[in-house]
């Protein structure tokens, strides 16, 4: 078995992403999983309406996976579920002011990391 360290040429994208993640970990914001963050970004960046079924299809995961992520994101106030009054089997997923504020802050963190990297 090989034990020597693998060398990797750092890419700008990975270095910037690392800087963003370190800043996020150091913030007071709750840790989100990659699935939760992907779900949140789809709801905020892709025109809706969004349903649990549609989000599961978009992310290529099961509806229970989306439901678990929505439970967490809903408890944080980042997303809200609303029943479709015309078809009670459908659940719409909607944006919230808290979710908008979170993503604005996260976007700012990415921008600051990118600017810091550009100065180097």
List the predicted regions and their residue ranges.
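N-terminal helix-turn-helix DNA-binding core of bacterial DNA-binding proteins
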Residues: 22-62
């Amino acid at each position: 078995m090989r034990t020597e360290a693998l060398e990797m040429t750092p890419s700008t994208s990975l270095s910037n992403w690392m800087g963003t993640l370190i800043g996020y970990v150091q913030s007071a914001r709750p840790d989100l999983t990659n699935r939760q963050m992907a779900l949140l970004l789809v709801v905020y960046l892709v025109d809706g309406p969004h349903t649990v079924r549609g989000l599961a299809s978009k992310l290529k995961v099961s509806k229970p996976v989306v439901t678990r992520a929505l439970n967490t994101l809903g408890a944080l106030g980042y997303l809200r579920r609303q029943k479709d009054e015309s078809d009670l089997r459908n659940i719409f997923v909607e944006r919230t002011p808290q979710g908008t504020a979170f993503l604005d802050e996260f976007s700012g963190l990415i921008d600051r990391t990118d600017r810091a990297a550009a100065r180097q």
